[in-house]
């Protein structure tokens, strides 16, 4: 894929700060990362609903959903996984510029890729949420039957089984989805957002 040298960035006359002021809250990416089955999608759905009910401008980007459209041409090789996250990072940045609290739920197994998204954003605009859950518990849950398929060899390069997952070392938030309820996890994240004056 060739890159064009003949493109120009066109600034909007409406700034991010103006959008945030109108919304009554800051914008940021709330980036859920964790193994398949750890609760990323479940908790992120509940968080988005809670933020929406509180009158916040919010939108959720989910790993499976994005692969139905924007990233449907990508597989699960290390290179494709990285490109998947790079594209999502660019979309998330646009949504932050639009003033939204952008909730994302992606396995995003590689630390370098997550840090690449962080680097796209301004300071304090990337909130990493680690959905901590043992692979044993995730496999026990197996809501999509993916671990079973991975064990049988039907799914190669499956994170946590036949492909690596690099857990965050210093996430802004860690939720223990093996022991805490969905409601407890959402309360923990909302508390963080309020304490750090995002909302």
Swiss-Prot record:
<feature type="binding site">
    <location>
        <begin position="34"/>
        <end position="41"/>
    </location>
    <ligand>
        <name>ATP</name>
    </ligand>
</feature>
<protein>
    <recommendedName>
        <fullName>Adenylyl-sulfate kinase</fullName>
        <ecNumber>2.7.1.25</ecNumber>
    </recommendedName>
</protein>
<dbReference type="GO" id="GO:0005524">
    <property type="term" value="F:ATP binding"/>
</dbReference>
<keyword id="KW-0418">Kinase</keyword>
<keyword id="KW-0597">Phosphoprotein</keyword>
<keyword id="KW-0808">Transferase</keyword>
<comment type="function">
    <text>Catalyzes the synthesis of activated sulfate.</text>
</comment>
<dbReference type="GO" id="GO:0004020">
    <property type="term" value="F:adenylylsulfate kinase activity"/>
</dbReference>
<comment type="similarity">
    <text>Belongs to the APS kinase family.</text>
</comment>
<dbReference type="GO" id="GO:0070814">
    <property type="term" value="P:hydrogen sulfide biosynthetic process"/>
</dbReference>
<feature type="region of interest" description="Disordered">
    <location>
        <begin position="1"/>
        <end position="22"/>
    </location>
</feature>
<dbReference type="Pfam" id="PF01583">
    <property type="entry name" value="APS_kinase"/>
</dbReference>
<keyword id="KW-0067">ATP-binding</keyword>
<dbReference type="InterPro" id="IPR027417">
    <property type="entry name" value="P-loop_NTPase"/>
</dbReference>
<feature type="active site" description="Phosphoserine intermediate">
    <location>
        <position position="108"/>
    </location>
</feature>
<keyword id="KW-0547">Nucleotide-binding</keyword>
<dbReference type="GO" id="GO:0000103">
    <property type="term" value="P:sulfate assimilation"/>
</dbReference>
<dbReference type="InterPro" id="IPR002891">
    <property type="entry name" value="APS_kinase"/>
</dbReference>
<comment type="pathway">
    <text>Sulfur metabolism; hydrogen sulfide biosynthesis; sulfite from sulfate: step 2/3.</text>
</comment>
């Amino acid at each position: 894929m060739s890159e064009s040298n003949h493109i120009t960035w066109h600034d909007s006359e409406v700034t991010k700060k103006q959008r945030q002021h109108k919304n009554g809250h800051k914008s940021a990416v709330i980036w859920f990362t964790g193994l398949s089955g750890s609760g990323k999608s479940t908790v992120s759905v509940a968080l988005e609903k809670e933020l929406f009910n509180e009158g916040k401008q919010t939108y959720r980007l989910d790993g499976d959903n994005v692969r139905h459209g924007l990233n449907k041409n990508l597989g699960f090789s290390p290179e494709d996984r990285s490109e998947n996250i790079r594209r999502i990072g660019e979309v998330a940045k646009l949504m932050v510029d639009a003033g939204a609290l952008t909730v994302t739920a992606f396995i995003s197994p590689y630390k370098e890729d997550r840090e690449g998204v962080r680097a796209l954003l301004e300071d304090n605009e990337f909130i990493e949420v680690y959905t901590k859950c043992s692979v044993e518990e995730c496999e026990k849950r197996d809501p999509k039957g993916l671990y079973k398929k991975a064990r049988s060899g039907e799914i190669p390069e499956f994170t946590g089984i036949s492909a690596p997952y690099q857990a965050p070392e210093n996430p802004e938030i860690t939720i223990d989805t093996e022991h805490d309820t969905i409601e407890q996890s959402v309360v923990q994240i909302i508390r963080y957002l309020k304490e750090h004056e995002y909302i």
